[in-house]
């Protein structure tokens, strides 16, 4: 059952990509590739060709998304000054130190007409002394569709992957006092309250430790110097400065230990769901956090229904929900890294757990497994990452539980534990020292210019197939050479595409 669901969602993904790239290759080429897939399924892999219906559904869903963005790109107010009103969902700082806000616009007033339901990325030339997250604002600016830059990076697709329709620059932002009852107001009032509590907590931490805590626990790098971030990138440990499924796993582990200790069972799972919802807000709706929360929710549902929880099925459903919500998110680096890491855990970790040095190999598996992706996406591969991740992740596995626990204590009681604060500072400083010592090895990072993603896709496909139970049942046990030919043809098709 789990293999069928995962394969159905894989075909849905193929449909999304076929439709997106049909813009460049043409509809005829897309239909040819679809026909090739049908033939391979039928003649070589003995797979029900009804799975190709999921490919067609994926094509239709991506087409709807493409037409929606095309409509947004041709709205009458594009590249013209308009009055915009909406709520700020997240905030950050660009490389020039200017505040950047993502705003959910519910009113765009242009030529006496009102348009709504768009998401805008705003760069403000006016610096604020306080957070605007959760505030209803008004600004006057030109809403532009992002163009592809000269360096070849498709920033328009990048913003679409984040669910952002337009980018804009404004000189002044006015805060509005929203009156009346609206669901959107209630939602952003909650977001504002959580964000205010987060900022109050950060103000209690010592300045030297504040940047690390904000980066490691909340995924915000604004308080960390660019030199320090570059050091973590050079050692291949920059992932600790971004929130991930590790954080959600730790919250789940702490909660389950407490419920087991006090014999509460599953009766208080709503508290866990509330904590996870709060953390999604704290992490600025990070894709990796949303993915991990979806998996935990599926685990809770499985326990309630007394069903066996399967990690691959949960990943597949979480992936499908992400793609249905925004088909363009397939091009988001955060989503790609998040689900690729999850697949490595599903397919590779069971083999590692049979070895003697399982804990060490599990830490090393992810930086090695993500090597091909890092080469294609970032043009580098860190040799030091294999060594540096072991002590750094060990320290982070201590730091994150202390940090999350101290924050939630403060959230419910406004009590800041000086003991936990001291541990946060000490472990954070030790983590930096250890990472800095590895960064001294300047030759630990290889610069590799290779941007053809087809080879990386083929490599990961081969690794996951060989490490799967399907490989042993179909190919090894039954010596089915026809299946091997089918997989070779799929590889050739990927290269042709």
State what each model feature region is.
Residues 2-8, 183-191, 211-222, 283-288, ...:
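Hydrophobic alpha-helical transmembrane segments
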Residues 345-448:
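Alpha-helical transmembrane segments of multi-pass integral membrane proteins
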Residues 61-239:
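Membrane-interface helix/helix-cap signal primarily in integral membrane proteins
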Residues 86, 141, 216, 244, ...:
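Divalent metal-coordination and catalytic microenvironments
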